[in-house]
Amino acid sequence: MTKSLSDLLQTNDFTRRHIGPSEAEQAEMLGVLGVSSLDELTQTTLPAAIQFDGELHTGPGMTEAQALAELKAVAQKNKVFRSYIGMGYAGTDVPPVILRNMLENPGWYTAYTPYQAEISQGRLEMLLNFQQTVQDMTGMPVSNASLLDEATAAAEAMTLAKRQSKNKGSNVFFVADNVHPQTMDVVKTRAEYFGFEVQTGSADAIPEGAFGALVQYPGTHGEVLNLAPIAEKAHTQGAALIVATDLLACALLTPPGEQGADIVVGSAQRFGVPMGFGGPHAAFLACQKGFERSMPGRVIGVSKDVRGNTALRMAMQTREQHIRREKATSNICTAQALLANMAAAYAVWHGPEGIKTIAERVHRLTGILAKALQDAGIKANETFFDTLTFEGQDDLGARAEAKGINFRLDGGKVGISLDETVTPQDLADIIEVVTGKGVDVQKLDAEAVDGIPAPLKRQSDFLTHPVFNTHHSEHGMLRYLKQLENKDYSLTHGMIPLGSCTMKLNATTEMIPVTWPEFGGLHPFAPESQTQGYAEMLAELERWLADITGYDAVSMQPNSGAQGEYAGLLVIRKYHEARGEAHRNICLIPASAHGTNPASAAMMGMQVVVVKTDEQGNIDFDDLKAQAEAHSDHLAALMITYPSTHGVYEENVRDVCDLIHQHGGQVYLDGANMNAMVGVAKPGLIGGDVSHLNLHKTFAIPHGGGGPGMGPIGVKAHLAPFLPNHAVAPTSDSHTGAVSAAPYGSASILPISYLYIKLLGAAGLRQSTQVALLNANYIAKRLSGAFPVLYSGKGGRVAHECILDIRPLKQESGVSEEDIAKRLMDYGFHAPTMSFPVPGTLMIEPTESEPKAELDRFVDAMLNIRREIQDVQDGTISAADSPLKHAPHTLKDLMDSEWTRAYSRETGAFPSAAQKAWKYWPAVNRVDNVYGDRNFVCSCPPIEDYIGA
């Protein structure tokens, strides 16, 4: 049959690239399940009451070339001016060796959070480098492996200060008036529902009895304060001192840790990460020893493996939300690992001399500007690192705009912040705009003002570890990055079947715009006239997401799923308050909920009441009804995930939502599992009032080894007036405070989700969901004879993921879910999710992007492992001698001169034919978690330890 021109244009080409199984393979898999089509599978899996049979209004799919061309036209509506606005955002030069080999490299950006340490040693090492960088620059002994942004890091520091302060009975927190306004905004939002009173004033005016104080160093307007007397006063009064600082400034300034700071926060953005209209960037939090077990966020620690070799891991996880739930130190889950790795690589690339040279250049240029201002009779701050502030002339903004320049214009004041991208010509342009006179920058150099007082000049060394003093040639750096990448398992190696994580394809086309200067080069507080491309893209993306979810309004501000939960609950609280029902503070949460749910509710000052689940994994409706009735007058919300965290579509979800509404509550429908709903159901149409969406799951933003992510929220119309706003760049008339430092969160990664939707179109989005269901049910069906599938819904089907019950086998054989997870590494796989939501289980989510061959390879590996367990059950080999207990096997194991194990080397490392064609090698043997927590070290070990490993 002759193809038409329409056929030849291949407008659906991307859909078949994104979806793993071919049409023929889909037909074969559908046959295994006993259905004839994807539509039949959908209709027989989803409850009839929730099915959406219409068509999404996202348009038809298009080719990759078409989509890129259209988005490029939108991006070019942005005007990339030279922005000297500052406020925690600075221009930076991304070293090309890092840009190409890390940021644009799927070996780095498609990996998951390094819970499985044995196959994550590369990024764990770079994250440890990040921690060391932060510790060295700030002068602090302990730091974490990134937070979402500087403002939320400050808010996290506030609650850490509360836990550590000597003033246990105090609810007063002090914020100096030299703190960035967006930080002030986020801190006030966070403080409200903790019951904290935020007081402000000059940095040295810490009130008696405050539990903590936050100051900026250098200040938002550029001044450099002596922190030592402020720290002394804070400590005398029993308060913890938090300092928000600039890593580059700390190359020249006496670091906060040497002046008495208890906690130091900030952003590592100017260490080689583009501004990106607000993000993503890696924030940091460092603290004194003794604070670490209350510290928020992931911390990388040094441990050892079973052979005694140095091995890295995520340390002290018992303080995190996935274990402590509502008692966790924070609800943080996704952080900014990829951006932290970039910042660490920047420090490795430049080394101490390079970093100091950049800092000296920025300071010298600022000193020349200070001299030019003096000569023009303009009075600016006398102490500074990179920022000068002075009274402005009425027409200065217009003159700057005509020159393609942005200054900070704030209440009659003008702020100018310089950065590493500024050239002498740029500085000459700035001076001409401000003074109206041309100058010779080189001649002014000899008269440059020194803005750092002698007592505040840094004397201590930094970045002394060999890793920061070795890789300064491009070949050296290239090979170091590659060596680390080769230690890690990512989607470039195979399927990452983590349940509740949706490790789908991050298509190359979707990633391309992330590094376009039109998106990366914009300051988040640039004038609206310069950001029209972003405005157009954001408006369309918000409209699409509202349509997909069945909600009426969307906020793009939350920059993680956990922050989306927090924002959604904030909206609910504001709604109740506006109705005169501020007393509503009870949040009902099923026992099976993700740990971020109760942690987020606790952060919103809500009392968590746990609802039972039944033997099928569903919400116990009788218990829910009893709890709703018992707490009716104070019921604020129910938080549920749909499909449930047990991987099934609960039949009575509409009844559940109706019950909550009858008692005056709102329904927070967690969108973590939205990959099972797009195009086939809408949370806003089944009773949800608000949901967050994990764009780094459902909408193809890569996980980055632990971030970035985005967690926008959709709400019904009655909640729309209460969406988060922003003090610096208002997005609405809402009086709700900000939850992120930037008004649109991590805006520069939103083009990924935009292209994902545009490329697939309405039909492709629906088909992707259907194939996600197909792949999960295919795996469940093939494995059900070997491992019990714990929960299933209508017709014995699962949703987009399935849970295998390992507990009976563990009881009979002594082989645990952890043993299976580690053994899968020998077969060339990342482990499924372990012991969530049920201890002793494995939760598998293959996503729609995995081809049938990969699904079969995984099933075959699991069936082989089941046979290995059977050998233990039959007494052929003891559990202790089994390859399952010794997994994973490394190349060093095979190189041992003596092999005394009860199985062959080949059985250990090459358990199936697939490994003989291609083999992924774990970098270390099983890591000793207990040793790592008992001997906590979160800085870089001696280089000899790496060599020994």
From Swiss-Prot:
Enzyme class label: oxidoreductase
Pfam families: GcvP2_C (PF21478), GDC-P (PF02347)
Xref: Gene3D superfamilies: Aspartate Aminotransferase, domain 1, Type I PLP-dependent aspartate aminotransferase-like (Major domain)
Any one Gene Ontology BP term: glycine decarboxylation via glycine cleavage system
Keyword Cell division annotated: no
Signal sequence interval, chain numbering: none
N6-(pyridoxal phosphate)lysine modification, residue list: K697
The entry's keywords: Oxidoreductase, Pyridoxal phosphate
Top-level taxon of the source organism: Bacteria
A Gene Ontology term for the protein's cellular component: glycine cleavage complex
Record's catalysed reaction(s): N(6)-[(R)-lipoyl]-L-lysyl-[glycine-cleavage complex H protein] + glycine + H(+) = N(6)-[(R)-S(8)-aminomethyldihydrolipoyl]-L-lysyl-[glycine-cleavage complex H protein] + CO2
Cofactor: pyridoxal 5'-phosphate
EC number: 1.4.4.2
Single Gene Ontology MF annotation: glycine dehydrogenase (decarboxylating) activity
UniProt xrefs under InterPro entries: GcvP, GDC-P_C, GDC-P_N, GDC_P, PyrdxlP-dep_Trfase, PyrdxlP-dep_Trfase_major, PyrdxlP-dep_Trfase_small
Self-association and partners: The glycine cleavage system is composed of four proteins: P, T, L and H.
Physiological role: The glycine cleavage system catalyzes the degradation of glycine. The P protein binds the alpha-amino group of glycine through its pyridoxal phosphate cofactor; CO(2) is released and the remaining methylamine moiety is then transferred to the lipoamide cofactor of the H protein.
Family note: Belongs to the GcvP family.
NCBIfam families given in the database record: gcvP, PRK04366.1
UniProt name for this protein: Glycine dehydrogenase (decarboxylating)
Lineage, top ranks: Bacteria, Thermotogati, Deinococcota, Deinococci, Deinococcales
Gene: gcvP
